[in-house]
């Protein structure tokens, strides 16, 4: 997500997403801040709050990646784009999507609906999902530095908590 352009392998094995909430933390390295700016609030909430992993083609349709290429051509396509031999621009989401992300009333409405759904599914027992919701909703209107600072604090708090420790131990087996 920190790249200008992202090229992914169009292969059945490729999965793209931010699964950290399934381990009781939230996406780090700017993920909870960058994804909303890249694909908008509704799609990023779906990806981050569920921790779902998407096939490359689905990720491309959602705007998570800018180009997909068959595995045998992936390196060549990426090099051509990096060297300027092939033009590739990020998809523009359009003014409606931009307006929705920048509208505080819409963000508040989306947040309240998402919070209701989260509470219904988790009964508030998974704090990472609620923290991720707050991070994603705030992302379009705050600076990268502010978002990174808040994200680091949230990850540190969540990673040292009992829910994260329990989920990681389940993951490890």
Give, region by region, the residue ranges found by the protein language model:
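Amphipathic alpha-helical segments at domain termini/boundaries
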Residues: 1-4, 34, 42-154, 172
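Conserved catalytic core of Hanks-type protein kinase domains
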Residues: 38
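Glycine-rich beta-to-alpha active-site loop
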Residues: 1-23, 27
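NAD(P)-dependent dehydrogenase/reductase Rossmann-like domain
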Residues: 162-173
């Amino acid at each position: 997500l920190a790249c200008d352009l992202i090229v992914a392998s169009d292969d059945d094995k490729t999965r793209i997403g931010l699964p950290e909430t399934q381990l009781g933390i939230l996406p780090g390295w700017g993920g909870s801040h960058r994804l909303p700016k890249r694909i908008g609030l509704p799609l990023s909430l779906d990806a981050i709050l569920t921790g779902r992993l998407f096939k490359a083609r689905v990720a491309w349709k959602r705007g998570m990646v800018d180009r997909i290429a068959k595995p045998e051509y992936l390196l060549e396509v990426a090099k051509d784009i990096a060297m300027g031999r092939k033009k590739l621009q990020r998809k523009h989401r359009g003014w409606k999507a931009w307006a929705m992300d920048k509208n505080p009333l819409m963000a508040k409405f989306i947040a309240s609906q998402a919070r209701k759904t989260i509470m219904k599914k988790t009964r508030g027992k998974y704090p990472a999902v609620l923290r991720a919701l707050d991070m994603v909703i705030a992302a379009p209107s705050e600076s990268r530095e502010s978002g990174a600072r808040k994200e680091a604090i949230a990850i540190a708090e969540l990673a040292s908590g009992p829910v994260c420790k329990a989920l990681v131990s389940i993951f490890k087996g």
